[in-house]
Each structure stands twice: as C-alpha cells, then as structure tokens.
Amino acid sequence: MDYKITGYEPAQLFHFFEEVSAIPRGSGNEKGISDFLVAFAKERGLDVYQDEVYNVIIRKPASAGAENAPTVMLQGHIDMVCDKLGSVEHDFTTDGIDLVVKDGVLTANGTTLGADNGIAVALMLTVLDDDSIVHPALECVFTTDEETGLVGAETLDKSQISARTMINLDSEEEGVATVSCAGGVVVTYTCPIVREHKTGSTLTLDISGLLGGHSGNDINLERGNGNLIMARIIDRLMVAGEPAIVSFNGGTKDNAINRECKAELVYADHAAAEAAAQIAKDIIADVTAELEVFDPGFTCTVEIADDAEVEAMDQKSALALIRALRLAPNGVIRRNVATDGSVEVSSNIGVVATSDDEVKIMLSPRSSITSLQNEFKDRLQTLADVLGFDAKFEFEYPGWSYAEHSPVRDVFVESYRELFGSELRIESIHAGLECGLFAEALHGLDAIAVGPTLSDVHTPDESMDLASAERFYELLIDVLKRLAA
C-alpha cells in the first residue's frame, strides 16, 4: 500500500498502523482485523489462538539466551470507537480510516482515528515481526469489544495465558504509567412511549460543537453534555408552555461525553413556536457563557417550520423523559480528597434515543471502590423505579487495585529514567482497563498500562503524536530486553 506516515522509526511500526487502520474494526465488527492477525502469525510460523468472539493470542518464543526468563504478556484491544462529524460521509462497517499527517501529528479526516487502541496492535505486530529484538517469551493478547464493556477480555479463556507479567498498551500519555483503574457498568433505562397526532409548527433544536471526550478520563474537565443541555432547554420550555416532544436523540456511545443532540418539538401555531424559540435562545446564551472556558465551541441552532403533521409523545411520556435526564446523576460524584483529588465515582449520560414506541437512556457509571459502585447502582435503580423506567445493568467489569510491590513497574521506572533522563509518572485512572479482568483471573499478575501520547480519544479530534509513538517503542524494546535478562 502507499504509506502516508514517513520519516519515523521504526518504519514498520507506522506501516503496521496504517495497515490496521485500513481494516474496518468498530466494536462488534472485528472479524476482519482478527483474521488479519491470524494470517500474520501463520505467515511467520508463530503459534496463534483465535476464539469464537475473535480474540487472538499470538505466542513468540524467547530470543536466544532468554529462554529462562518469565513469559511476558503484551496486550491491547483491536476494536475502536466509531464517531464522526455530522458533515462527514463515512461508513465504519466498510471504510478504512482516512489518515491525515500534519506537523508530526496523526489524525483522521473527520472521524475517530482509532489509535485507541490501534497503536497497541501495531506495537505488538512490530515486536512479533522483528527477530533482532531481545525479549522473553511473549504472549501477545489482542482482545475484542473493549469499547463496549471489555467484552472480549471478559470472554477470553484465561487458561490460555501462562504469563504473570502484563504490559497493557492502552494508556494515552507518554511518560505516565497507569497502575490501577476504576470499575464500571453500562446502565440502560427504557420506558414505553405513547404518541398522539399533532398539527402545528415544529421547533427544532440542534446542539453541536461540544468537545466531548472519554467519559472516564475527561469527566473531570467540566465539558458540556449535549443531552443535559437539551433537557435543560426543554424543561424550561415545558414550564413556559406545553410543547409536545416529537424526537430527542443524542450520542451513540455510553462511554463518550455527548457532543451533539437534536430534538424536535411541536407547538399549536407559529406564534407559540416563536415565543418558545426566544426562550430557548436565552438559555442557549446562558449555556454559551457558562461553557466559555471549558467548552467554547458550543452552538445550538433553532429552527421553526410551519404546517407540520407529526406523531408526538404524549405529555406523560415527555415528562418521564425530561425528568429522568434532569435527575439522573452526571459528572463527578465523589473525589478522593484525602490524596490528590482524583475522581472516585462518576456517571455519564452518553446516549438518549427515541423511537416510535420507546425512549432509551444509556449511562456509564464508574468507581474505583467496589462498595461505592454497588451503592451507586442502587441509587440508579431507585431513580428508575420512581420514574417508571426499566433499568438494565450490563457489561460490568472490575477495578484494578494498586500493588505496593511491582517488579514490572520498577523496570519501567528505571528504563525511562536511563533513556530519557526524567522520572516516569505513576498514576491511577478513572476509566476501565482490561487489566482489571486479567488481574482478577490470573492470580499474582504483575501489571502496568503504558502507551504513547494520544489526545481527544473517542472523538473526531482524536490524534496521535508520532514522535511520542517513536519514543515509546524505544522504551518498550528496552523494557523487554531488561525483562529478558
């Protein structure tokens, strides 16, 4: 293929990233990339395992002289979050990612880049492909459906893994090692809708321009959530009059902070719609001022169309929807004030979708403390009961606790110091990592999560610092050499 990324070493690392990016691999659509990995292994005579959900393990024997060193697992996920700007035409089920290189930064043309976690795939393929590297026996574990709830890692038969040292490659800041993470669960509220025929003038509200972001890593940044802003506007309009809601749709991923939301209301006549439009514009002005520092790109258009005939939600259905969005917890719920103020409990209202007969709200609560996670789930169930929603709790995953003693952490700290002359920062994150599932299943697992610098993951602004990826590969190879000694 004609490679776009040039001038960075090793060239093969970036070539593999481009090859991976050419394969559609949204969550739930990983067969193509999984089969690519199997073919890669077979072409090189490496042992390979593929399961029914397309997880892949590729095993490579230790390099000469390192046969007695403990086996090391390298791990990352092969799926990506699929999100795009509304103006971009892109079919994630059939189209590869259109890469853009500018000033040392890699992005995509109006879509998510997929460096989360495509760079991990490329890193492992490069290590497996290069027989000059000194390393212990390797088990490269490629998991599926991480972005929808760590599904592949949960499903994987852990007896296939002999390693008790794990290097997870799904961290997003160079110079930082993650050593513990939050657990979480996907919560889906559903409620039936009753519709009734309405005529009059429609008022369409369309929110865009918000930064969005990862609902764990970015939840503390006070960014706007399109679903909540829309609910705020409609709540005020319902106090001022009685609009009927035709539709309310925002977000596609529970684990992404919502950037865009669109709602359609219907009023009896143009005058009523015009009065409501002015109220909406006043609230939009307030929100714009409130988000000036944290989310300055926020916009919301207001349009009126006359002579409409629609099937709108009845008042009871509309009230249930807006009350749920106004009352459901969102954002930072609790911080660890005893240490660094890091987030301990949070929630994100990522998706609101109305169909002909149902409304669905998807939330992503997280906590680094199991008891608080359980208590928060109880609160969400109580709220659902009060509002008349059905609540479903799915894809729950455990947190990963900090280990006082960690040889692999010590090796990374020493290697980073000697290579770059500075200290590796050790952190915990408020997001789910597959490390928690592996640590739960593999007794005595010594794990660390690392990676090059990525920005704005899960959004169309996602980017990767190419020089950072270059340096990170140097660090990884040095660590493997030390672990082989």
Language-model features, listed with the residues they occupy:
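A short beta-alpha structural unit
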Residues: 18-22, 253, 264, 299-312, ...
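Active-site-adjacent substrate-binding region
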Residues: 223-248, 402-445
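Active-site metal-coordination/substrate-binding segment of hydrolases
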Residues: 66-164, 190, 199-202, 315-318, ...
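Acidic/His- and Gly-rich active-site-bordering loop/insert found
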Residues: 3-105
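His/Asp/Glu-rich mid-to-C-terminal helical/loop segments that flank catalytic regions of hydrolases
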Residues: 159, 223-240, 270-273, 317-326, ...
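Zn-dependent metallopeptidase/amidohydrolase metal-coordination segment
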Residues: 5, 10-13, 337, 344-360, ...
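Fold-level recognition of mixed alpha/beta catalytic cores in primary-metabolism enzymes, strongest
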Residues: 136-226, 234, 238
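Acidic-enriched catalytic cores of C-N bond-cleaving enzymes acting on peptides and small amides
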Residues: 196-200, 219-249, 268-346, 380
